[in-house]
């Protein structure tokens, strides 16, 4: 291992000079350690990542933690490889930082735990799976109208308090229970409190044992926030490539990844591009997203929360992300206010998998009919608000009646919310979902009260609920 000395410290940017003509490769990890000599000093154990070659045997690096206490002349050791993080079953149920160090107050990982570097090539063309396979989630509104693809990328849009976290938890639970799948959660630029809450909620709901969690919180330097998504992805890739698993990979929030990249770019002195973003925005996004894919062995399916600055979808950060997405799930506050959970907007959510060749003719026809009837209901709402239901034609009254049943039937109880609602969660297979909506659209349940359709799973549960309400079925 070659040694050098710190020559300059500029916040999260540290320059290191090496001797004997040695120059570490780009992305190599460099370690700076220093034992405090007196009470005015602090112990330093800092990892840097090489970002630029400056010439004269010097490199410019980005710090993965605070550089407080680092001074010129401190010894820096080139580790000769990129940052490496633990992978495999030892990561399940644990919480890590960007360097793969556990931060959950449990026992440290065994010293001989397998490790992989966070920088690697995307899978080669001949390793990619060309089959388009639907990932059944058991959540009706998702499976029917915006189905997820195994190895695909899904954008999850939603404000505060509309149910993003609960939807993420339910997806983790359903994949674990029904498919025996593993999940990796990467909190990128997250609020520490939210990450903490998520950890304890997952512990309480029992899904933590199938999940690895990685956090680079909001208060950490941009280097940590930019690399933490790669740390999580490396853990997910191991389960895909070495164990043939179908892995679910959550990133919250992908915008913070871009934001951290922008900060690093400015610190390295690069000329900013449009709206102040880094000129390498598309490259950085591509390097991350291209590694998230299906191979002949397994798949990594990613669900990414996306913050849209000032609701401007043409902003370079969300616009660059959209190019990579296969499906979008939009959460709508109005639906959560109506008590419809999950509050997924059935008209704004999209998926490239919703075509007859992929989901089948029947599923496609039912999904399109559901969207048409909900769209017509939306158009009629202004008339209803002004003139009331009585002014509608008989045909439109029937549309409204069925649309409301459809809207309520798109809701369902979640397993992870059982302790709050007191009602059992439901996992609904796609076939049952399609059958239920088809029968509602055909008018088979026009005689049942609307409330019987609210927060249930299969269509049979609607009939049972109606019986409990004293309605003759």
Swiss-Prot record:
Question: Which keywords label this protein?
Answer: ATP synthesis, ATP-binding, Cell membrane, CF(1), Hydrogen ion transport, Ion transport, Membrane, Nucleotide-binding, Translocase, Transport
Q: Where in the cell is it found?
A: Cell membrane
Q: Which cysteines are joined by disulfide bonds?
A: none
Give the reactions, separated by semicolons, that this protein catalyses. Answer: ATP + H2O + 4 H(+)(in) = ADP + phosphate + 5 H(+)(out)
Membrane topology classification: Peripheral membrane protein
| Gene Ontology MF: a single term | ATP binding
Q: Please give the GO cellular component terms listed in this UniProt entry.
A: plasma membrane; proton-transporting ATP synthase complex
**Which Enzyme Commission number(s) are on file for it?**
7.1.2.2
InterPro entries attached here?
A: AAA+_ATPase, ATP-synt_VA_C, ATP_synth_F1_bsu, ATPase_a/bsu_AS, ATPase_alpha/beta_chains, ATPase_F1/V1/A1_a/bsu_N, ATPase_F1/V1/A1_a/bsu_N_sf, ATPase_F1/V1/A1_a/bsu_nucl-bd
SUPFAM superfamilies named among the record's database cross-references = C-terminal domain of alpha and beta subunits of F1 ATP synthase, N-terminal domain of alpha and beta subunits of F1 ATP synthase, P-loop containing nucleoside triphosphate hydrolases
Q: From the UniProt annotation, give the residues forming the signal peptide.
A: none
- The UniProt annotation places ATP binding at 158-165
User: Pfam families, per this entry?
Assistant: ATP-synt_ab, ATP-synt_ab_N, ATP-synt_VA_C
Q: What does this protein do?
A: Produces ATP from ADP in the presence of a proton gradient across the membrane. The catalytic sites are hosted primarily by the beta subunits.
Q: Sorted alphabetically, which HAMAP family does this protein's record hold?
A: ATP_synth_beta_bact (MF_01347)
Q: How does it assemble?
A: F-type ATPases have 2 components, CF(1) - the catalytic core - and CF(0) - the membrane proton channel. CF(1) has five subunits: alpha(3), beta(3), gamma(1), delta(1), epsilon(1). CF(0) has three main subunits: a(1), b(2) and c(9-12). The alpha and beta chains form an alternating ring which encloses part of the gamma chain. CF(1) is attached to CF(0) by a central stalk formed by the gamma and epsilon chains, while a peripheral stalk is formed by the delta and b chains.
- What family is this protein classified in? Belongs to the ATPase alpha/beta chains family.
Q: What is this protein called?
A: ATP synthase subunit beta
